[in-house]
């Protein structure tokens, strides 16, 4: 991964690594997907103050941030280990890599 990123990107990367280890999930075997998702989370963190899931469409992003449902880690991820963005994958997922670090 490229090393010159914003503070928010670095924070999201650290969060993702910690969360993957804690939940025993793995990053996608195509790390370009992981990078794009982290960039989207960092952008939303900068713009809205929270890491809103970048892989969904929202009519009102500020309203979604306030509801917290789709803030990463989203409710489906926390409850069922279902990550729509493919950032956190269970080891039985065909797209899961073997890494929990970036």
Curated annotation (Swiss-Prot):
GO terms for molecular function: 4 iron, 4 sulfur cluster binding; electron transfer activity; metal ion binding; oxidoreductase activity, acting on iron-sulfur proteins as donors. Disulfide bonds join 55-85. Its EC number is 1.8.7.2. Keywords: 4Fe-4S, Chloroplast, Disulfide bond, Iron, Iron-sulfur, Metal-binding, Oxidoreductase, Plastid, Redox-active center. GO terms for cellular component: chloroplast. It holds the Pfam family FeThRed_B. It comes from the Eukaryota. It catalyses: [thioredoxin]-disulfide + 2 reduced [2Fe-2S]-[ferredoxin] + 2 H(+) = [thioredoxin]-dithiol + 2 oxidized [2Fe-2S]-[ferredoxin]. It is an enzyme of class 1 (oxidoreductase). It is found in: Plastid, Chloroplast. The record marks 84 as: Increases the nucleophilicity of the active site Cys. [4Fe-4S] cluster binds at residues 53, 72, 74, 83. Its cofactor is [4Fe-4S] cluster. The active site is at residue 55. Gene3D superfamilies: Ferredoxin thioredoxin reductase catalytic beta subunit. Binds 1 [4Fe-4S] cluster. Heterodimer of subunit A (variable subunit) and subunit B (catalytic subunit). Heterodimeric FTR forms a complex with ferredoxin and thioredoxin. Belongs to the ferredoxin thioredoxin reductase beta subunit family. Catalytic subunit of the ferredoxin-thioredoxin reductase (FTR), which catalyzes the two-electron reduction of thioredoxins by the electrons provided by reduced ferredoxin. This is Ferredoxin-thioredoxin reductase, catalytic chain.
